[in-house]
Each structure stands twice: as structure tokens, then as C-alpha cells.
Amino acid sequence: MMIPIYIEEKKYMVEDTKNVLEVCLSLGFNVPYFCWHPALGSIGSCRQCAVKLYDNLHCVPDSKHINFGRLVMSCMTPVIKDMYISLFDKELQEFRKNILELLMVNHPHDCPVCEEGGNCHLQDMAVMVEHTYRRYRFTKRTHYNQYLGPFITHEMNRCITCYRCVRYYKDYAGGNDLGVFGVHDNIYFGRVQDGILQSEFSGNLVEICPTGVFTDKTQSKNYARKWDITFAPSICHQCSVGCNIILGERYGKLCRVENRYNSKVNGYFLCDRGRFGCNYIHIKNRPQKLLKKQNNCGYIEINAVDAVQDCVNILKSSNKIIGIGSTRASIESNFALRNLVGADNFYSGMSFFEQERLSLIFEILRNSGIYIPSVCDIENYDAILILGEDVTQTSARIALAIRQAVRSKSDHMAKYVGIYKWQSLAVTNFAQDAKYPLFITGIDKTKLDDIAMYTYYDSVQNQARFGFSIAYAVDNQVSFVKDFNLNGLDITKLDLVVEKLMCARKPLIVSGSNSGSKELIIAAVNIAYALKRKKSDVGLVLVDHDVNSIGLSMMTSKSVDDVFNTLSDTNNGNAVFNTVIILENDLYRHASVAKINKMLSNINYLIVLDHQYNIIQDKADLIFPVSSFAESDGTVINYEGRAQRFFKLYNPQNYDKNSDILESWKWLYLIHDTYVNCTRVKAVNIDYIIDSIACCFPELKKIKYASPKSNFRVHGQKLAQSTHRYSGRTSINANVNVHETSTPINDNTMFTFSMEGNSGNYSKKCSYNQIPFVWAPGWNSPQAWNKFQDQIGGNLYPSDPGVLLFDTGQENKCIDDNLYKSINWLKFASNSLNISKYTNKWIVAPYWHLFGSEETSQNVECIKNCMLNPYAMLNILDAKYINIQENMYIKFTCMDQVLCLPVKFSMDLPKKHIGLPMGFPGIPVFFSGMYVSNIEMMEAP
């Protein structure tokens, strides 16, 4: 309900559930604070956010009634109808200044050497309250700084005891290895002893901390102050969630990765893989030059004109041209390859089974009518079932949202007794450890088990059987698989799951492709369909593996196995010339060595475009070095069908005139235009490609609304990617040439690679939401996001970036069966899901890891430091049966590939399964669900 309040004698209508601090910030007032955070709520520990509250309107703050008001902490004070607040009272200003001086008693005077300088909330607040002189002249407290791992630097002496770090790490993220120790003015925030922080979300401490206690260790190698950095809005490419990030560069080196607020996706937080896993763009063995194979005896460098012409000559001499796309390449790059080779010759590059699962997920997104919630929507569900997907390792930001959904029961319980959600300590004390039900099925333990009501560990086949059982129990008219063998399943637990899902106001079903089972996906949809028939406001989340898995699935349904079959059929004794073009894809992750070698024997030319080195490049005839996501523009589509744009941070040619690196789509269009003798008046830009995509794929026509076009201007200006305080622009290249270089030109987007442009995006009348850097007058730190939102924690102005491509039935809460006539494909579910009875073979169970399973981030040095060594996981009973002890080595064969790995034991992994860390070097992702044979013990290599 909206109520009137008065701030500085002016009337405002505000929500009655908010606190005074939140209301003031939403209205654009500058109120200093430290301990409060929009995602964490209020505890009132810093005393910095004081305001003056008057009893009534007649007690205005003038000389006559100067003592009528009282100081209150705005973060702990709920708004009340007709309350009168002063923000600029003299007594109040003096109080704030004194509080900040007390907080600074033990804070070192090290701003010039602190890496938080220029991006520091403490600096902002000191300026805001006009604290300039410190009277404390005695010894300062000193602390021991801990080693917290390769991601975060610890400098405890800068702490002002706001308690934000432990409230986030323990209460919000569910970590248990960071705590608070000591009493009085000797408080310590850290671990019991030195060691790597175990939470997958520890990197958010860097932005949560208002001072420099926790800083980004990975930034130190290429450090630059915030005002000297060029920024660009981008999308994290490390999983299918598509979190919004801000990239920063100086001297052509990535020096900063920050969270970019989006109320529909990642909110205020990122996972550690997304925050720290981007530096692969500077890996030393990255392709940098155009290379051509010379008579099978090595490569020579060639120029761009010759490379394009050589490629065209190859294509013109070929009878068959095949293009293999990539789930880590943008929609535009994949389309450019498809445009070059033709729709019939364009393949996804995924294995047959992975392509089958993704095509199924795409069909569900397009036709099911079941609502697919965003990451932040997930936090509003009150019963969750996870089928076979270890989301902490495959889509960590979803796991963090699930934690908030489970713990939100406390908020709802407190609401009924008049306790507001932002009163975090009161909510915790009242509700204690109340949780909404979470049920998990999997092959082994997960990091979410600590908050689960029930966990079920078994093979993916039995997990699917369990899922179909739930669907049938919810509504026996819905499930197409009715004859279930429930041996080994706890019927009472099945009844518990069904009861909680049916009683829930908003149940959520989570599954995905990473389990390696299409039956699990079908079971998840059956459950969601059954619940929706019962008039439930159900949600369905189906996780994919890569950032653009859905986007590529919308363009083709042909897998890399179809490539092998096509080439085998094409050759078949005939003298034909075959050419394969591979776009940003390591085929050895998706197909066996034998199949790839056979493909190579059936082709005459291999052309590779990539920004990462992989073994397939050693077989290539031409290698085109292409831009990484930080050096290019493009669109990707996340798991919910949300199209999001990422923007070029810098042009490699700006720092190296001899660089051959171009965007994939730019190389492919150069080749295409030369191949078809097309002369363009104007070079192809990304707007042209997006318009072409919209014409070819009606389901992708909305991607043009994911971002303004390149001709977008604000007051006739492009948007600046650097702050107006950017220094040294004219001297960056002075060591190479004393003559000042011209400002780089960006023709593809509405941004400019400089400070010269519009940077007034902090205005709430702003007409764009693609924010290159977060800054507002007086707000230099990430806390400045409050200046870009319609209300605290709300949408960005004018709306959040990105556009949903599918109408997933959010409003269809009461449906009839006619809506589902288009999803008869659910009927292909197998009536019997039998476990293999082979006694001499083992099924590969996929173990995914946040650090190591993703193709590109595993090349980053700090990620390598957190990766486990490759291993083989066995059930402890199986190990005893074959007389294997832990840490011994076993040798086995999978898909004609011989592996030798140390053994680990699990109590929960199903029998006759061998768990392998998917995606690790030497363990391709297509191993999931395959058979292992010839296990034998051996000495450690």
C-alpha cells in the first residue's frame, strides 16, 4: 500500500513495507550507509545512516523547534504514514561525521596504495559526510592477513566491522568457512586458518565489502584505477545462465570483471567461474596470426587478403562444403557460417545425444506453455524438485537462487506477524531455521544437500523412473509412462515429494542436459505438466551446458555425428573434394578420436576459426584467429530463451596494428562476399546480420530488440565507454610512436572506445539500459547501482536488458488440455528404463565441476589452482569387490580411448558406475552415459 511521508517538507508516496533508507535512496537522496545492502537487509550496526525523525509536521527543524526531532537509524526505521524526516539537519550531519571518524580510528591511511581506491564505498561516504580531519593520534590495531586462495586478497586492517561479509557469505550464500571472531574493537573476519574459500560465490565479497578488506587478486597483475579503465557491458560466457557482467581493459589487457545488475538474471551477484574465469582471452598459445599449411611441413604466416582468397579458392574447388558451428560462438557468428555453407550443410558440432537433448529442450521452450522462470524468479518458489542436475557445478547462479527460495520461508512466516523482510535479524530470530522443501535426485552428493529435505541417489535411469512416478502420482491422466518398477524406492518418500509439490503455491522443477539423460528431461516436463493441470503455478528450469546452446539449437538440429555420416556417404569410392569449416569448436570434446580421424581422412581441406588453441588446429589447412567475446559484439540466448547482447571492449588493432584478429562473423562475411563476388557499398555490420537473422528465423526476430542499433544516440552522441576522468589516453602508445593516435572508431554499436560521448546514464530519465560502467556523482563504488534502478532492488531504467524470445505461459495458470495438443512428442518416453545388466562393463556417470569442466575457463591460471586432479570415482562396494584401494590407479578404455586415473570412493554413487570429471583435459563431455571396459589396476605413472 502506498502511504504519504514528508522528506524535507516535501510529500512523497511510498510503499508501506519499506524502510526509510531504502525509500530515500529510491527517491534519489544521498544517505550514507555501510552495513545495509539491498540483498541482505538491515542490521543497524554501522550507525551511519542516521536521519532525523520528527513527531509531526508542526515540529519542523527550525531554530524554534531544533530539539523536537530525534535521531534514528534509517535502515532500521519502517516508513509510517505522515512521518516527517530531515536528511540535512546540522545535528544530524555532525553525528554522521563523528560516526565515520570513529569507524576510521583503526582504518589505515593507505588509499594511494589500496586497490579499492577510486572504487571504494568508504571513500564515497567520507566525502558525502564531509569528514576530512581525524583526531586519533594513537596506535592503530593491526591484524594478520590470511591466504584465502587464488581469487581474493585479504587486508583485515582496513575493516570497519560492518558485518556485510559474514552476512553474505554465511547467511545468503550458505558458506561455512568464513566467520567473525573476537570482541569489542578487536573483531576479525576470516577463516579459522589460512586456506581457499570453499564457497562458489566467494568472489562477491569483493563488491560486498565497502572497503578494501577483500580485493580481487586477479586484477593485481593488470591493475588500473577505475577512472583509467575502458568498460563495456557484456555477458558471462561460462554457462547457460548468461549473467550480465562489466568488463574493463587498459593497454589491451582485461583488468576488471564486475557484476552488472540485472533484476531478471543475476541481480547483484556472480559465481566465481564467471568472475574469475575470463582471462583465457590472453592465454599465451592463443591463435594470433593467419596461418596456412605449407606442403605438410609446417605453417607460414599470410596476410588477410591472401588468406581470404586462399579460402575462396579452396571452397570453389570443393564439391562439398560443411560448416560446424559452436555453442560458445554468438548467434551472429553461427549465422555467418550457415550463410556461407548453406543451411543444409550447417551442423551444430555437438554429439548426437547432446543435440537430441538440446533439441528436446528447445521444443519444450517453444511449445509446452510451461513457464520458464528467470534466475531471480526462482527465488519466489516454495517447493523445488531437482532431477539429476548438479546445478551448483553446472549453473551456479541458479543454485544461489535456489538457496534464497528455500530460506524465503522465514520471510513469509515473519510477514504474517508484521516483521518486514528487510529486518534480517528479527526474521532469523522468529523463523529460526525454517525452510521450504527442496528435493534432489542425483548420482552423488551435491553442495545443495545441506538444505534439502530429501535426497535420492541412483542411476539416471532410476532417477527418471522416480520422476515419472511423481508425475503419475500427481495426475494419472498426464504421464505417458504408467508401469513403474519401484523396487528400491522409498514409497513414503515418494508420497512426501508428491504431497509437498501439490501443496505448494509455486512449485519448481529443475533438470537439464548435463545429466546425459533425455528421459530425465521428459520426466521433469511430465511433472510440470501434471502440476499445471492441477492449476498449480508451476515453473520449469532446464539447464544447458553452454552460453549459446539454445541459440545454436534454434538454427540447426544436425549433430557432429551427422557430419561423419554425410562425409562417409559422400566419399563412398567417388573422387570428390570435401572441405570442413570449424567455428570456435574443439571437436575432441564432442566426438571420439577415431571418428574425427576418419572424418579427416574423408576431407581434403580443413579450415578453423577460433580464439583458443585446440588439437584440431594442428590438422588445419587454414587458421583464422578470431576475437574472443571481450573483443567482439554479438548475441547469445540463455536457458530461458532470453536473448542478450555483449559488446566489444576494445579492438585488438588499436594496440597492435599488425594483429590479424577479427570477429568470426566478419571473417566469414569477407570470405562469403569474395566467394560470391559481392561488392558492398558499406561494410557488413552487426545490425545487418541481425536483420538477416530475423528474416531467416522468425523465432529469432526479437533479438533486434535486445539492444539499440548502432545509430542510437543520446543528444547526438554515442555512449562513452570510459569515464570523463580517463587519463593518459594520448600517451598510451608513446613508447611506440610519439605522435598521438586518433580515437578508435566503433561502427558496430552505439558505444565509442573513449571518454568522448554521453555518460549520463545515471539519470532516471535515461533512455538506454546497456550500462558500460556504474558511476554517478558522489558514487564511485558498485553501490552506485541504486542510481540506475526504478527502486532499490527493482528494474533498471528504462527496463532490464535482454528480451525473451518465447511466451512460456506465465499467465496461463488455468489451462485446458487443448493447449497441449502440440506436445505429443512427450509420448516417445520409453516404457521401460532398464539398467544395463552387463557384468563386464561400467556406465560413465558425469561429475561436473565449477572449476575445470568448462572449456575455456579451465585454461585460466587461477582456475587451474582450484581444479581437482582428474580421477575415477567408484562405489566403495564395487571397489571392495574388485579389490581396489583409494588413491590406487586404474586403467580402462572408453570409446577407444585409454585412461589411467587415481581412484576415489563414494558411498552414494550407484553400483556398476564409474564417475569421471566431465570436460577435464583428456575427459571429453561425450563420455557421459558411455560404457567403460577392461578396468585393471596399475602402478602410479
UniProtKB/Swiss-Prot annotation:
Amino acids binding [4Fe-4S] cluster 1: H107, C111, C114, C120
Family according to the record: Belongs to the complex I 75 kDa subunit family.
Binding residues annotated for [4Fe-4S] cluster 2, in chain numbering: C159, C162, C165, C209
Sample GO molecular function, one term: 4 iron, 4 sulfur cluster binding
Name used for this protein in its record: NADH-quinone oxidoreductase subunit G
Cofactor list: [2Fe-2S] cluster; [4Fe-4S] cluster
Keywords: 2Fe-2S, 4Fe-4S, Iron, Iron-sulfur, Metal-binding, NAD, Quinone, Translocase, Ubiquinone
Catalytic activity: a quinone + NADH + 5 H(+)(in) = a quinol + NAD(+) + 4 H(+)(out)
UniProt entry tagged with the keyword Membrane: no
Species of the source: Blochmanniella floridana
Gene: nuoG
